[in-house]
């Protein structure tokens, strides 16, 4: 059985792509950030350390839910900032339940993605729990905390150190250029995914399981 991991650097469009894949394939999608938002709203936090604990709890919940789907033999999608540190946990889950993961790894022009990253926390649609670090919910009447923005160099260094753009699991990688999401050739992406994910396909046990496929922008 298969699952799909949607990975990539922050603000690359993982949630948007994961939702579209989920709707196209008719399979469930689990998002760590969505779980974190529920924990932010239900439990809140009063320090950076407490916020980090909620992030850790969200990861445990994500993997628990994935394990239940695996026990039922269901295909599904996980969306997360997968990084080098994620590999032991996800690989253990895949091996325990005999699943193979297709990694959809989002990439593109880092300057463009950085601009999306810098603008995201200023958006009214961004959950404030992701933005603030000291306290959430924010006390009534308190001045709104502004995000401490990483420089472009810090953004690049963090991506390189954490391995967002090199993550892969135990199956093939579809590397997708998301520099301009409006120009993404989504039907081509879905054609590639459908071919990989057809039950019984030979890629699961083939020697080409780690071949990188480039899905470029539609021109």
Language-model features and meaning:
Residues 97-119:
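Conserved phosphate-donor/acceptor-positioning beta-strand/loop module used by diverse small-molecule
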Residues 123-184, 204-216:
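Small-molecule kinase domains that catalyze NTP-dependent phosphoryl transfer to phosphate-bearing small molecules
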Residues 13:
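Conserved glycine(s) of the Walker
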Residues 16-71:
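Conserved substrate/cofactor phosphate-moiety recognition/catalytic segment
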Residues 3:
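Walker A (P-loop) ATP-phosphate-binding motif of ABC ATPase nucleotide-binding domains
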Residues 6:
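Hydrophobic anchor at the beta1->P-loop junction of P-loop NTPases
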Residues 10:
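The conserved Walker
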Residues 73-76, 100-102:
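Loop/turn-to-beta-strand initiation segments
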């Amino acid at each position: 059985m298969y699952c799909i991991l949607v990975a990539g650097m922050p603000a690359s469009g993982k949630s948007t792509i994961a939702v579209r894949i989920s709707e196209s394939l008719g399979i469930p999608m689990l998002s760590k950030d969505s779980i974190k938002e529920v924990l932010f709203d239900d439990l809140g936090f009063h320090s950076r350390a407490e916020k980090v604990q909620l992030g850790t709890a969200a990861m445990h919940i994500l993997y628990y839910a994935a394990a239940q789907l695996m026990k039922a033999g269901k295909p599904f999608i996980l969306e997360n900032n997968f990084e080098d540190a994620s590999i032991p946990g996800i690989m253990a889950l895949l091996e325990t339940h005999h699943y193979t993961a297709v990694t959809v790894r989002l990439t593109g022009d880092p300057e463009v993605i950085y601009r999306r990253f810098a603008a995201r926390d200023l958006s009214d649609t961004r959950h404030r729990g992701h933005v603030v670090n000291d306290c959430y919910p924010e006390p009534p009447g308190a001045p709104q905390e502004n995000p401490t923005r990483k420089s472009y160099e810090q953004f690049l260094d963090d991506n390189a150190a954490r391995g967002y753009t090199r993550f892969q699991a135990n199956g093939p990688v579809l590397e997708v250029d998301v520099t301009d999401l409006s120009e993404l050739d989504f039907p081509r992406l879905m054609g590639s995914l459908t071919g990989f994910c057809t039950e019984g396909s030979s890629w699961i046990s083939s020697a080409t399981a780690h071949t990188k496929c480039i899905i470029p922008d539609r021109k």
